[in-house]
C-alpha cells in the first residue's frame, strides 16, 4: 500500500496536470472535482466502471477503467500522480509514473494543496467525521460563508459528490486510518473522539493517540482545537493542546464543557439546549441520536470560530438532512423501512442502534451487519457482539476484507457467536443474497431493518425491498 510521501505543494498551481488512481472513490472523485474546478487538467483510472466515472466525464475529466501505464498519456516531470493508501506499490501506473519523474502525492497531500491559502478546518475522530464535516458545510453555507469542502460522503439530496469549491473556509474530513491526517495545517481542528482503531497500521493504542497529538501540533499559530469534553480520548487531547499553548474549545454534556448541552433528547429528531457563553440556544435536528447532537455541537463551535452567526448556524443545522450511508433511509416496502449506515466500529454500531430504537417505535430493530477488515474483526469481535445485542434480530455477513488478506480463522462467525442473544435471533449468513432472501422472508410490517458496515452490505437493503415488493 502507498502512504504519504512527505511532499508539500503550496497550492495547486505547481501540480501541473493531475492523474488520480482510484478516481471513482468518494474521496478521490471529490479531489478531482475540486482540481477541475480550479482549472487543472485532470484524468484518472479506476478498477471498474461506475456512475461516478460517468459524472466526472461530464465535467471534462478523462477517466478510464483498468490500470495501465498507457492511461498516463504523456504525463511527465512537472505533472502529478495522486494515490491513496489503498494503491499498492506494484500498481503499473504508479511504477511508470515514478520512472518518468512524475511527482507522486498521497490523497491527503493533494487535499492539503487545495486547502493552502484558505481558512482550513480539518475534522478528525474515530467516529462522526463525515457527519460532522457535512453539518459544518451546511452550517457555513446557511451563514453565507460560501465554504469549500471535501467530505468522505455525499450529502443526502446533493449531487456534488461530497466536494465543492467556494470562496470561503475549506472544510476537509481528515482520515486518521493511515496517519495521513497529519498532512494538514489548518486554522481549526475538530476532534470528535479518540478511540483506538486501525491498529493494523498503528500497532498500539498509544501510537494511535500520539498520531492525534501530532495532528493537533500541526495547527497554524493562533489556531483552535474543538474537542468533545464527553470523550476521554478527546478530552486528553485537549489537555495536550493546552499544554502546548493551543486554544481549545470543548463541547458536550459534561459540566466542564465550554459549550454545554442540556436537556438532550436523542429521539427520531434529536434536540438539546446549547449553552454558549451563558446564552442558552435551542438546537433542533432532523436526524436521530445523541451522537448527532454531539456532532452538531462540534460543527457549531467550528462555524462560530470562523465568523458565522450563531443563529444562522443553528438554522442550518436544523435543515441538515443527513449524509449518504449515515442513517440513510433507502425505502419502505410491505411496512418495513430499510435504513443504511456506514457504522463499522463497535462504538458506532452501539450509537446507531440506540438512535434506531425511538425511530422504530413499537416495531423491531433488525440489523444485518458486515464486519469490515480482518484485523478489526479479530480485535473487536466481542465488542461488536455486545453492541449488536441492542437489536431484536441480528444477521451477520462474512468479513469484508477490503485492503487486507483473508484469514480462514477470522470470519463473521466470530461476531455472530459473540452476540448475547438467543440462538434463534442471531444468524451467520456469509452470502449477501442469501441473507437478503432470509430477511425478506422473516421481517414483518413495522420492522426497521438496518444494513450496517463499511463494505458492500449496502446492496442488501435494495434487494430486500425488491423481494418485499414482490411478495
From Swiss-Prot:
Alphabetical keyword list: ATP-binding, Cell cycle, Cell division, Cell shape, Cell wall biogenesis/degradation, Cytoplasm, Ligase, Nucleotide-binding, Peptidoglycan synthesis
EC category name: ligase
UniProt subcellular location: Cytoplasm
Chief localisation class: cytoplasm
Domain of life: Bacteria
Homology family: Belongs to the MurCDEF family.
Function: Cell wall formation.
Protein name per UniProt: UDP-N-acetylmuramate--L-alanine ligase
